[in-house]
Amino acid sequence: MRPILRPRDPMRRSASLKVQSYISLGLPGLGSRARKLGHIFLAGLGLALAAATPRPARAFGDVGAFDPRVLLTGSQTDAARPDAPARWAVELESRTSAPVRHRPLRVRADEGALTDEPFAYWSGDKAVEPLTANEISGLRRFVSLGGVLFVDDAAPEASGAAGPFGRSVRTELARVLPDSTPIAIGSEHVIFRTFYLLRRAEGRILGARTLDAIMRGGKAAVVLSEHDLGGALAKGVTGAWQFPVTPGGDAQRERAIRLAVNIAMYVLCSNYKDDQVHAPFLMRRRALEPSPSEP
């Protein structure tokens, strides 16, 4: 992966040259000790001036930008809450300054493009159609490469249990990952601590205190929610929230947004405590691709 090269900033260069010129004068009239202290002071001043100079903003779509891509299967054409992914990106950017894609993509489970990015958002309010062999293969490859899939049930039962969408997705995931069973993860898991400290999971509805996850190599590869997180995020064309949040109103919505931010940060960082950037997903994908000379 090539580093992103940036043009030199003339203001930074100017500040640096000024400091160098002052130091090169030898600060006449001062003793050697005072001259040494002066060198240190001017060098520090130069670093401060350089640091204060605004840096060019990162372009959308830079490597590492968070893209809450909508996963589509069967005849599905969009997320259950179509405006939620873009709002997710906006909230993440405004609260953390993390790079985001402002217009999240849509990707089908049987497309090779699924493995172009390390995150996919699968939401719905009705039962999904049985996955095709190609969809199963695509999702299995995505997870095996280290991708994170977030499953958001937009229509759970009143009790907080999975609705038709959630139940059917779990059935299909058992076909994708037959050797893995979802387990409950609560406030002790890093997802609840990546950026905000959260005590429980919440969305448009209160639901269970925990999320469910399919763990692969110690990492939550699939995260399942029966809270309609997208419903808490979605805004209409007027800028007003599209759906009421029950029973906790605005305070619950804020905590739901914080959970969405934490999930995004979990995707961007493979290990929060060590502050490590997410593992190079694209490099792993390319390592498994045949070279052009192979049939």
Where are these regions (language model features)?
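N-terminal secretory signal peptides that target proteins for export/translocation
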Residues: 1-35
